[in-house]
């Protein structure tokens, strides 16, 4: 009888652990909303206090998700325009724990339950894809850069499975030129237990957030390699800068 029960107990354990992690995430989101309210993040999202609280909250989130990071290189000191390949919704917290940064996100995120509130609390800039507002958004980003706020963008405009990097849209590369701040490329690579690329961790196509998260919660560990490239001077036209940054990201993923 014992021999029959024991395997079932072992089979249940991963599901219990997954449910426990999910509960912790829900509680952590509510904690984040409470923290954002207490420190006034919804009204003044760009204060240093909010940035420190954001880094703390993101680090705790990665701990809940059992994320282990391998970091190569160092982030640019001071203000920078960060550009990265885009694989998953997890990209943002991974980069956010490395340095103080504000994000450019698709407009739909603003309306996500709870997550949208948190995004607004940390000063996220939203853009509607295909709306033709990239030019005006470049000017807005440049204004933030001039105020000393580092901005992260994903120039592919979508996510991939990590096997390749799509062409970088160049419109937003006008922002660092207008603000005269360096561009720093970075590369994200999600790995399996053998250190090889793991496309299963990508959030692509018609993937739904809650289903993707549910699958991720079953993993013992999520391993991500984040590589910081050499900063680039924002000289030249935006198409040239986009190609140069794209090449730098490809080179880091191939290393």
Language-model segment annotations:
Residues 141-142, 149-173:
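Soluble extracytoplasmic domains of inner/organellar membrane proteins
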């Amino acid at each position: 009888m014992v021999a029959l029960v024991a395997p079932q107990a072992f089979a249940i354990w991963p599901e219990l652990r997954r449910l426990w992690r999910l509960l912790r995430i829900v509680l952590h989101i509510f904690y984040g909303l409470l923290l954002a309210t207490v420190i006034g993040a919804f009204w003044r999202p760009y204060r240093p206090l909010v940035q420190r609280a954001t880094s703390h909250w993101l680090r705790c989130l990665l701990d809940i998700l059992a994320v282990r990071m391998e970091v190569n290189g160092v982030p640019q000191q001071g203000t920078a325009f960060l550009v990265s390949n885009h694989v998953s919704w997890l990209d943002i917290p991974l980069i956010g724990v490395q340095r103080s940064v504000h994000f450019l996100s698709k407009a739909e995120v603003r309306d996500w339950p709870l997550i949208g509130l948190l995004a607004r609390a940390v000063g996220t800039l939203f853009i509607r894809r295909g709306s033709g507002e990239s030019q005006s958004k470049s000017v807005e980003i440049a204004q933030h850069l001039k105020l000393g706020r580092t901005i992260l963008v994903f120039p592919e405009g979508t996510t991939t499975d990590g096997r390749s990097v799509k062409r970088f849209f160049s419109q937003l590369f006008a922002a660092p030129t207008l603000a005269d701040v360096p561009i720093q490329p970075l590369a994200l690579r999600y790995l399996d237990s053998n250190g090889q690329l793991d496309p299963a961790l990508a959030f692509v196509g018609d993937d739904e957030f809650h289903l993707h998260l549910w699958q991720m919660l079953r993993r013992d560990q999520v391993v991500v390699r984040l590589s910081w490239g050499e900063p680039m001077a924002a000289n030249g036209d935006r198409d040239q800068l986009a190609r140069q940054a794209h090449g730098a990201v490809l080179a880091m993923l191939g290393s």
